[in-house]
Amino acid sequence: MAKDIKFSADARSAMVRGVDILADTVKVTLGPKGRNVVLEKAFGSPLITNDGVTIAKEIELEDHFENMGAKLVSEVASKTNDIAGDGTTTATVLTQAIVREGLKNVTAGANPIGIRRGIETAVSAAVEELKEIAQPVSGKEAIAQVAAVSSRSEKVGEYISEAMGRVGNDGVITIEESRGMETELEVVEGMQFDRGYLSQYMVTDNEKMVSELENPYILITDKKISNIQEILPLLEEVLKTNRPLLIIADDVDGEALPTLVLNKIRGTFNVVAVKAPGFGDRRKAMLEDIAILTGGTVVTEDLGLDLKDATMQVLGQSAKVTVDKDSTVIVEGAGDSSAIANRVAIIKSQMEATTSDFDREKLQERLAKLAGGVAVIKVGAATETELKEMKLRIEDALNATRAAVEEGIVSGGGTALVNVIEKVAALKLNGDEETGRNIVLRALEEPVRQIAYNAGYEGSVIIERLKQSEIGTGFNAANGEWVDMVTTGIIDPVKVTRSALQNAASVASLILTTEAVVANKPEPEAPTAPAMDPSMMGGF
């Protein structure tokens, strides 16, 4: 395929046009008075949203050079969303500001590499100062406040705060569509996995069709149990304790299953068998998780263990197990807390190392099950369009809240970025590096400027007053008042603000140091065959 190539100023200018088109579309959503953007969908009704990354992903420009610029900014939004879960619009606004100011200086003859070094130094100083002025987030009210700011709904803030309180900060909180119009919270405490009983005759409550085991022993194995003789010595030992047994195995079939069912029906022995969750290597990892949670050992050839030789020492224990036809929930496992903490640390390190979104999601689920539960926020709305928009807002709020708990909070509404200007301005740099620092100083003002503009105020006036104010005091664009931002609940997670600035500076620097852009030339359309003269067509 033939290529189209542009150099120097032509290359940068074409990319910057794309940056501006995307940023101008996204930045109208910033702040409490931000507007919505309507996105046409190939099927169904249009999507109305104010979520920066969702809008950025939809933008595709006809001009290849402009499209490359737009895609780079879209990448900033996506990366910020992946790291912090929010702050995508702020990242887009910062990128545009750094690119715009940087391009002026490069065009005037400044060295792009020197500018880049200055930008990197200034951003590092800004990030350090953000961490210095951060306040830790703890307590239900503070968590609810962060979530309410991000979702623009106090009710959603309460749901997320309650969910995190119930399942822990590392717990899985999923967002699903409700069948009704009301949004509600449902929490499953304990470790849950999607495997139900192998026989309905194992239920203890015929009305609810569930089996509830109080203070059970738990046998965990990756083997298939077909012969009852394999586990008979172990069953006899458990029978002496007069406690129920949960069997988690690759499968239970052959003569083993009917024998267990028969003993259950006769009242000899209260036992429930379920298949092991997951597949392949993930199954082994999940069985190990269950073993650590319950204080048991996985009976597997990998450890040189055989079912025939298994003793009571390999069995796990828990306060309660509930099994229905589709799922199993283990509550209050008897595992050692330090062993569980070590397992959680291993899973967290695997999450950081993986590059696969799917693997990260599965690791997050395992982490949550070890940490103590799963919460489901069921979103209700009057129309499908409203439902989609609400789900996006709640996802943003959930990510922002987790980020706040992790690294703390700073004043919201772009105030924190203006608060760090003094520290960045104090940097002693020379030449083009000083120019790079000055570009960052100007860019740090841009989110406040845009929030003020969207709310109908003059940004320059707001910024000048903000620079004279104490740290923590800021402009509430929702009502035009000057307030203590944290006390009023206008806050941003440090992780969100930091990620937005770092990602914006990274991509903007790449654009400024670009000297050539290579794009595919559009292929000429194939000529269409001329229509045949009807008089030349044969008849029957």
Swiss-Prot record:
InterPro entries: Chaperonin_Cpn60_CS, Cpn60/GroEL, Cpn60/GroEL/TCP-1, GroEL-like_apical_dom_sf, GROEL-like_equatorial_sf, TCP-1-like_intermed_sf. Keywords: ATP-binding, Chaperone, Cytoplasm, Isomerase, Nucleotide-binding. Signal peptide: none annotated. SUPFAM superfamilies: GroEL apical domain-like, GroEL equatorial domain-like, GroEL-intermediate domain like. ATP binds at residues 29-32, 86-90, 413, 476-478, 492. Pfam families: Cpn60_TCP1 (PF00118). GO terms for molecular function: ATP binding; ATP-dependent protein folding chaperone; isomerase activity; unfolded protein binding. It is found in: Cytoplasm. Its EC number is 5.6.1.7. Its main location: cytoplasm. It catalyses: ATP + H2O + a folded polypeptide = ADP + phosphate + an unfolded polypeptide. Together with its co-chaperonin GroES, plays an essential role in assisting protein folding. The GroEL-GroES system forms a nano-cage that allows encapsulation of the non-native substrate proteins and provides a physical environment optimized to promote and accelerate protein folding. HAMAP family: CH60 (MF_00600). This is Chaperonin GroEL. It comes from Streptococcus agalactiae serotype III (strain NEM316).
